[in-house]
């Protein structure tokens, strides 16, 4: 099952935008993702929804952060996260794609900085693969703003992800040996910038139950879409769920 990297970004922003100190919420939801890989149908996957904001650390979905410095306007933290992007040839309908090597999800470690203003929050982060699957790293720059309309909160976000050459080539490149097995042309992917937009809605029911839905859209650059593994130039993600706020 392939889960797009943008789901991670989509998850993290709404929790960061609405969390308060020492707030814990746990829930479950479903994520729908249009995979850019050829031979995949749309994916729907059950997911946990986890958020915790403490004085020294936080959990924002797949990211654990250890706060190094925090003030009214700035937060700097070390991060450990799980990168869910993967490719499983046995889960693909295309014969040529079935001949390719598996690309594994991986663990990442890095740093994240948040800057808060009245008009919104800016996030800048970078994280490297620590399991030596891709030997690459990923960066992110985004801005988001929470708007309150009665009990409903809306959080639009705009951002860009950066994949270095090693990361891009691991997930989207095709080696010479893979090319001979599959008949697909060999391809060496370059570093890539992936812009995205998202909108998150949260609505509390009573004191503890919170309904959440998020939609995200990303435009894939030619460094990715030129790969014979890819058959679309955009990706859409939708997440919905319910959580219990303690």
UniProtKB/Swiss-Prot annotation:
Domain of life: Bacteria
Repeat as UniProt keyword: no
Keyword vocabulary terms for this entry: Cell outer membrane, Membrane, Signal
Record localization: Cell outer membrane
Classification via Pfam families: MipA
GO terms (BP aspect): peptidoglycan biosynthetic process
Membrane topology type: Peripheral membrane protein
Signal sequence range: 1-21
GO cellular component, one term: cell outer membrane
Family under the similarity heading: Belongs to the MipA/OmpV family.
Protein name: Putative outer membrane protein YiaT
Organism: Escherichia coli (strain K12)
């Amino acid at each position: 099952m392939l889960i797009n990297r943008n789901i991670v970004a989509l998850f993290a922003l709404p929790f960061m935008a609405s969390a308060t100190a020492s707030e814990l919420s746990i829930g479950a939801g479903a994520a729908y993702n249009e995979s850019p890989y050829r031979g995949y149908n749309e994916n729907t996957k059950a997911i946990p929804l986890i958020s915790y904001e403490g004085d020294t650390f936080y959990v924002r979905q797949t990211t654990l952060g250890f706060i190094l410095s925090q003030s009214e306007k700035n937060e700097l933290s070390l991060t450990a996260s799980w990168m869910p992007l993967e490719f499983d040839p046995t889960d693909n309908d295309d014969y040529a794609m079935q001949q390719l090597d598996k690309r594994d999800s991986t663990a990442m470690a890095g740093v994240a900085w948040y800057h808060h203003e009245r008009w919104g929050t800016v996030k800048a982060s970078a994280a490297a693969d620590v399991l030596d699957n891709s030997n690459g790293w990923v960066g992110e720059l985004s801005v988001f703003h929470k708007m309150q309309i009665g009990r409903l909160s809306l959080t639009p976000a705009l951002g860009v992800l950066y994949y270095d050459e090693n990361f891009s080539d691991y997930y989207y490149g095709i080696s010479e040996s893979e090319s001979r097995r599959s008949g697909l042309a060999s391809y060496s992917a370059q570093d890539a910038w992936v812009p995205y937009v998202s909108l998150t809605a949260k609505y509390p029911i009573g004191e503890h139950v919170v309904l959440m839905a998020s939609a995200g859209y990303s435009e894939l650059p030619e460094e990715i879409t030129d790969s014979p593994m890819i058959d679309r130039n955009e990706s859409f993600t939708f997440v919905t769920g319910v959580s219990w706020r303690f």
